[in-house]
C-alpha cells in the first residue's frame, strides 16, 4: 500500500542508518532502491501482468456488486434498517477504492506516471477504504449483537445516532489516513520508473514504524476482537433460542467472520513478522527478507479481494437483497411483476421479528 518519494540528491542522507532492504506496508522495495539494498532480492514481485489481471477482475466485480448494493438500499427508503445504512457506507467505501484500481494496475506496469496530485488522492482513497471498511464491519457486528442478544434497537434505531456513527467513522478514517496525504509524492530518478512513496525527512524510520502499528491495531486487531466478541455471543444466543431462521443467520455470521479472516489474517500475520524483524525481535536474514517481501505482495491481493467479496457476503447471501433487486427490475419493466416473491420487503439485510433481526 506504500509507495516511495524522495529527491534523488538526498538519497544518502535520507536513508542513512536505515535498513533499505525491506520497508513496505503492502508492497516490496521500490525498484530504484534495489542497488542500494544490502540484500540482493531473489524475486521481489509477483508477475506484474498477473497482478494487473487480478486488479482488473476485482475492479469489475467491485464496481458491479457495490453499485447494485447501493442501488437496492437507496431504493428501499421505507424499510431501511440500521445495518442497511452501514452497508451503504461500506459499499461506498469499497466503490471508491475500486475506482483507484485501474491507476494502481497501470503503475504496476509503467511505474507512477500520474504525478503527485493523483499520488496523494488515490493513496488517500486506498487508506480511507482500509480503515472505514473494517470499522463499518465492526459496527455491523455490534448492530447484530444488540438486535439478537439483547433484542433491542433502542440505541441504534435513532437516525441521528446512526448518522453520527457513520460520519465519525469517515472522520476517523480520514484522520488515520492524513499522513499519506501529507507525505506522499512522486519521485523521478534516472534509469528507473517514477514511483509514489512517503517522504518524512530524517525521521522516516520512526514514522514508518508508527504508521505500521496504526493499521495493525485500528485496522485489524481492534475490529477483529469486536467482531469475535459480538458474533460469539450472537451465535450462543441463536443456539439457545428457537428462532425460525437461526440456521440461516448462523451461516451468514460464519461467512462474515471466515471471509474477513481469510482476506486479512494472512496479510497481518506477515506484516507482524515484518515488524518484529525490523525491531530486531526476530533476526533478519536475506532469505527471510525475500520470503516476507513476496508474502506481502501475495497477501495484499487477498486484502484487495475483500472489497469485491463484501457484496457477496452482506447482500447476495441474503434473500432480501435479491427481492429488492427484482423489485427494481420490475419497476423499470425489465421483468414481470408476477415473478416477484409475495413476501418481498424493502430492507434486504434480514428478516425481523419485533425488535430482533435474525439474519445479516
Curated annotation (Swiss-Prot):
Q: Which residues are glycosylated?
A: 22
Where in the cell? Cell membrane
So which stretches are on the Cytoplasmic side? 76-84, 143-163, 232-251, 316-360
UniProt-listed GO biological process terms:
calcium-mediated signaling; cell surface receptor signaling pathway; cellular defense response; chemotaxis; dendritic cell chemotaxis; immune response; inflammatory response; interleukin-8-mediated signaling pathway
List residues, modification Phosphoserine.
347, 351-353
Q: How does the entry describe its membrane topology?
A: Multi-pass membrane protein
Q: How does it assemble?
A: Interacts with IL8. Interacts with GNAI2.
Which ranges make up the Extracellular topological domains here? 1-48, 106-120, 184-208, 274-294
For this record, the Gene Ontology CC terms, alphabetical, are: cell surface; external side of plasma membrane; mast cell granule; membrane; microtubule cytoskeleton; mitotic spindle; nucleoplasm; plasma membrane
Say yes or no: keyword Glycoprotein present. Answer: yes
Briefly state the modifications made to the protein after translation: Phosphorylated upon ligand binding; which is required for desensitization.
Disulfide-bonded cysteine pairs: these are 119-196
Q: What is its main location?
A: membrane
Question: Mind telling me which PANTHER family this protein's record contains?
Answer: C-X-C CHEMOKINE RECEPTOR TYPE 2, CELL ADHESION MOLECULE
Recall the GO molecular function terms of this protein's record.
Answer: C-C chemokine binding; C-C chemokine receptor activity; C-X-C chemokine receptor activity; G protein-coupled receptor activity; interleukin-8 binding; interleukin-8 receptor activity
Site-annotated residues for (Microbial infection) Cleavage: 35-36
The alphabetical list of record keywords is: Cell membrane, Chemotaxis, Disulfide bond, G-protein coupled receptor, Glycoprotein, Membrane, Phosphoprotein, Receptor, Transducer, Transmembrane, Transmembrane helix
Q: Does the keyword Disulfide bond apply?
A: yes
Name the chain's protein.
C-X-C chemokine receptor type 2
Organism listed in the record: Homo sapiens (Human)
Amino acid at each position: 500500500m506504500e509507495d516511495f518519494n524522495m529527491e534523488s540528491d538526498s538519497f544518502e542522507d535520507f536513508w542513512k542508518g536505515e535498513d533499505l532492504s525491506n520497508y513496505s506496508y503492502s508492497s516490496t522495495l521500490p525498484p530504484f532502491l534495489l542497488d542500494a539494498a544490502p540484500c540482493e532480492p531473489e524475486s521481489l514481485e509477483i508477475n506484474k501482468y498477473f497482478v494487473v489481471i487480478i486488479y482488473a477482475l476485482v475492479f469489475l466485480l467491485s464496481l458491479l456488486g457495490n453499485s447494485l448494493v447501493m442501488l437496492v438500499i437507496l431504493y428501499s427508503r421505507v424499510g431501511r434498517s440500521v445495518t442497511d445504512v452501514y452497508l451503504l457506507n461500506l459499499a461506498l467505501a469499497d466503490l471508491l477504492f475500486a475506482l483507484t484500481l485501474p491507476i494502481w494496475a497501470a503503475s504496476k506496469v509503467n511505474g507512477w506516471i500520474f504525478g503527485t496530485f493523483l499520488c496523494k488522492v488515490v493513496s488517500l482513497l486506498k487508506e480511507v477504504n482500509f480503515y472505514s471498511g473494517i470499522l463499518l464491519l465492526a459496527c455491523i457486528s455490534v448492530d447484530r449483537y444488540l438486535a439478537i442478544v439483547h433484542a433491542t434497537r433502542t440505541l441504534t434505531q435513532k437516525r441521528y445516532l446512526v448518522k453520527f456513527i457513520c460520519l465519525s467513522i469517515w472522520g476517523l478514517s480520514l484522520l488515520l489516513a492524513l499522513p499519506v496525504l501529507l507525505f506522499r509524492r512522486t519521485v523521478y530518478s534516472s534509469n528507473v520508473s517514477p514511483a509514489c512513496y512517503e517522504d518524512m525527512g530524517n525521521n522516516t524510520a520512526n514514522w514508518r514504524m508508527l504508521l505500521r502499528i496504526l493499521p495493525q491495531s485500528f485496522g485489524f486487531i481492534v475490529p477483529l476482537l469486536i467482531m469475535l466478541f459480538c458474533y460469539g455471543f450472537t451465535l450462543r444466543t441463536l443456539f439457545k433460542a428457537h428462532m425460525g431462521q437461526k440456521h440461516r443467520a448462523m451461516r451468514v455470521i460464519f461467512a462474515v467472520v471466515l471471509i474477513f479472516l481469510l482476506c486479512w489474517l494472512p496479510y497481518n500475520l506477515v506484516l507482524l513478522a515484518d515488524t518484529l524483524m525490523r525491531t530486531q525481535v526476530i533476526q533478519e536474514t536475506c532469505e527471510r527478507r525475500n520470503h516476507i517481501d513476496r508474502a506481502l505482495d501475495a497477501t495484499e491481493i487477498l486484502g484487495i479481494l475483500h472489497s469485491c467479496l463484501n457484496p457477496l457476503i452482506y447482500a447476495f447471501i441474503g434473500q432480501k437483497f435479491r427481492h429488492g433487486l427484482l423489485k427494481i427490475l420490475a419497476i423499470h419493466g425489465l421483468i414481470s411483476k408476477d415473478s416477484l416473491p409475495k413476501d418481498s420487503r424493502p430492507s434486504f439485510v434480514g428478516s425481523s421479528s419485533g425488535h430482533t433481526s435474525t439474519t445479516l
